[in-house]
């Protein structure tokens, strides 16, 4: 596969200025993904070769997809990478890119950053964006928590996390992308009253989101829909047990109208799963 570092955009070099170095990363990090073979078929390889130089940001370092030392995602970075100071929306885990590319096409006045770790997903996003000739979208193949650690305050208008890896085993819940530490970094990155939109079709993950986010200082749940969820986690393969557990009411959101119906979401609906939407607004910390 073509080395992305040889073709990708390097906004840090383009700015020609010194930026605060990224903090040192621990040797052993909890990752929200597992690296798999990234072999591309001919069509996706051509997409990578043709469009990486236009859309792919050269900010990754190392096989764990850490953010390269010296990179800071701030307004100067945005202006260098996108060529304007329009609001920035970041989608974490864009998969095949269907949603983020559709959003970018529908909102040319907004900048979009697609975060995806898997080569085929990155390549397919490049393909969709390139076929439409979009100019307001960029792609970064990095670990999202690491990028938000080096994102300056007030840089991002919205963060989207739609259908993240559910990590169903209880021992793996620490790998779920929605965590208090991540919420803290996203809160800092967002503009005043910016929002974090989350969606999942896994009931156990919905409970996890409520446990992490509801009542967390600095966040306001903007939902208006009452849902009933079990009060305990059931673990992988035990979803049927949830119906007999004690339940409580929680507040969630209507389906986000800005999210297209992707193939992934269609499969969840076809399997009879309920979609849980969340909208959390960043407010002043107490």
Curated annotation (Swiss-Prot):
InterPro entries: SAM-dependent_MTases_sf, tRNA_(Gua-N-7)_MeTrfase_Trmb, tRNA_methyltr_TrmB_bact. The keyword Transmembrane helix does not apply. It is an enzyme of class 2 (transferase). S-adenosyl-L-methionine binds at residues 91, 116, 143, 165. It catalyses: guanosine(46) in tRNA + S-adenosyl-L-methionine = N(7)-methylguanosine(46) in tRNA + S-adenosyl-L-homocysteine. Substrate binds at residues 169, 201, 262-265. Residues 1-21 are annotated as: Disordered. Its EC number is 2.1.1.33. Pathway: tRNA modification; N(7)-methylguanine-tRNA biosynthesis. The active site is at residue 165. One of its GO terms (molecular function) is tRNA (guanine(46)-N7)-methyltransferase activity. Keywords: Methyltransferase, S-adenosyl-L-methionine, Transferase, tRNA processing. GO terms for cellular component: tRNA methyltransferase complex. Catalyzes the formation of N(7)-methylguanine at position 46 (m7G46) in tRNA. PANTHER family: 3-DEOXY-D-MANNO-OCTULOSONIC-ACID TRANSFERASE/TRNA GUANINE-N 7 - -METHYLTRANSFERASE (PTHR23417), PENTACOTRIPEPTIDE-REPEAT REGION OF PRORP DOMAIN-CONTAINING PROTEIN (PTHR23417:SF14). Belongs to the class I-like SAM-binding methyltransferase superfamily. TrmB family. NCBIfam families: tRNA (guanosine(46)-N7)-methyltransferase TrmB. This is tRNA (guanine-N(7)-)-methyltransferase. The gene is trmB.
